[in-house]
């Protein structure tokens, strides 16, 4: 998928010294060695041809647009490897959600903030990793992300360092202190510019508001989202503005074991502009006496189709779990630089793209975690086999230099040695 050209398009290149592609490749493969860069340098194993300072300078480069890099790479994978194999009527979606990027034990990290973790219902030090992903219902690919600090200066532990205002790094820092709904629109615009094929944008109630629905619609996507049952948010129903709870109480519900309780058409009004929408009230499985509201700006979709498409939003939750449990998201990078943390996030996203694509192309029933462990074992085998082959080549060279023996005889000795080793080891060496 032309990784080097994607890096170059994102301004990740060097005029001299080690190429950016080699440094990125080293960081990409680091997780599969089960050791950090520090431990590799300490024990002298799997050490690169460049110093650690080269890696740190690369990750702190201000001019690299990591949002653009992951967007371009995911766009190429989607267009070249996934969409051609999908049916034309499949509903491809973009999914927006955030997750905690924890730095609880840090004090001097750039733009560090006290953020609320909605999953654990407590405040933590770190960032909100706002992520945009793509899914066709079978394969999920991360598209881009931004590490959000907070627009509230009281909750911000450290401010951004002074950088050149013309650089991508400065724009990245300015976006980090914007509201999540504004940052979400920037990520969607980046995906739209890359022409990623998707018709709907899915998000939960944290991002749902009439303003957000209008903004996403202006970019060119329909929205299917969960909406809060708050008395402060109004929608126009029968020429009257009212909250969703009032609309629910005014209508007769469906009886029996139906997938939904009620379906109504409303108008989403913002600054005099009206967008027609359909609201589907579904029963809350966790609390049977309560209901949830799913809204779609595509009123031509059936209620069952709205519920089915919104179910694809769960893919991004699986993505967050795999990245944190297996791909060392936030654990591998302890840098205090905001640019380095952004680079680390892009590298983790690229690793997940590889796992996701491998799972799809191999028609593999294994989970992402199982695939990760498989690749880790495979990397260990390759390293060991390379060392064994080097020893075998040195043995052949010593025989040729110090003993008067023909090449045919050396081949016979090597073949006899290979026949004498265990079958399992022999099969791995022959496969290599």
Identify the role of each PLM range:
Residues 27-42, 68-77, 133-139, 293-296, ...:
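Short N-terminal helix-initiation segments at or just after the protein's N-terminus
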Residues 1-68:
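Gly/serine-rich nucleotide phosphate-binding loop at the start of the catalytic core
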Residues 23-28, 129, 347-355:
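Short, amphipathic alpha-helical segments that act as regulatory/interfacial helices
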Residues 1-13, 70, 89-90, 107, ...:
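Single, function-defining residue in the core of a domain
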Residues 11, 61-152, 264-265:
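Active-site-proximal, Lys/Arg-enriched surface segment
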Residues 20, 35, 52, 66, ...:
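Alpha-helix initiation and N-capping motif
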Residues 24, 127-130, 182-189:
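Short, contiguous clusters of charged residues that form electrostatic/catalytic patches at enzyme active sites
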């Amino acid at each position: 998928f032309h990784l080097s050209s994607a890096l170059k398009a994102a301004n990740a290149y060097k005029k001299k010294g080690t190429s950016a592609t080699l440094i990125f490749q080293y960081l990409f493969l680091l997780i599969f060695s089960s050791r950090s860069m520090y431990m590799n340098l300490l024990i002298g194993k799997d050490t690169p041809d460049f110093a650690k300072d080269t890696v740190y300078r690369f990750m702190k480069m201000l001019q690299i647009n990591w949002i653009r890099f992951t967007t371009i790479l995911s766009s190429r994978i989607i267009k070249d490897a996934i969409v051609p194999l999908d049916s034309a009527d499949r509903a491809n979606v973009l999914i927006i959600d955030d997750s905690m990027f924890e730095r609880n034990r840090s004090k001097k990290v750039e733009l560090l903030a006290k953020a609320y973790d909605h999953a654990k219902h407590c405040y933590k030090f770190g960032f909100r990793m706002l992520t945009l992903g793509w899914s066709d219902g079978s394969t999920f690919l991360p598209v881009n992300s931004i590490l959000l600090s907070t627009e509230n200066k009281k909750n911000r532990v450290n401010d951004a360092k002074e950088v050149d205002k013309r650089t991508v790094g400065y724009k990245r820092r300015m976006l980090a202190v914007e509201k999540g709904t504004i940052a979400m629109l920037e990520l969607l615009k980046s995906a739209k510019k890359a022409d990623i094929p998707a018709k709907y944008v899915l998000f939960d109630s944290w991002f749902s508001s009439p303003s957000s629905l209008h903004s996403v619609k202006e970019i060119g996507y329909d929205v299917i989202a969960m909406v809060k049952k708050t008395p402060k948010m109004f929608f126009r129903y029968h020429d009257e503005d009212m909250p969703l709870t009032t609309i629910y109480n005014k209508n007769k519900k469906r009886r029996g074991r139906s997938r939904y309780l009620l379906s109504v058409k409303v108008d989403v009004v913002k600054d005099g502009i009206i967008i027609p929408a359909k609201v589907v009230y579904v029963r809350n499985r966790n609390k049977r006496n309560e209901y949830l509201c799913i809204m779609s700006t595509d009123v031509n979709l059936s209620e069952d189709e709205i519920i089915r498409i919104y179910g694809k939003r769960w893919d991004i939750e699986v993505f967050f779990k795999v990245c944190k449990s297996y791909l060392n998201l936030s654990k591998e990078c302890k840098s205090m630089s905001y640019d380095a943390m952004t680079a680390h996030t892009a590298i983790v996203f690229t690793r997940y793209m590889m796992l996701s694509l491998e799972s799809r192309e191999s028609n593999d029933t294994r989970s992402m975690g199982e695939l990760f462990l498989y690749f880790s074992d495979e990397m260990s085998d390759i390293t060991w086999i390379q060392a064994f082959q080097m020893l075998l080549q040195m043995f052949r060279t010593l025989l040729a230099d110090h003993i008067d023996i023909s090449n045919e005889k050396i081949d016979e000795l090597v073949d006899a040695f290979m026949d004498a080793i265990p079958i399992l080891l022999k099969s791995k060496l022959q496969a290599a």
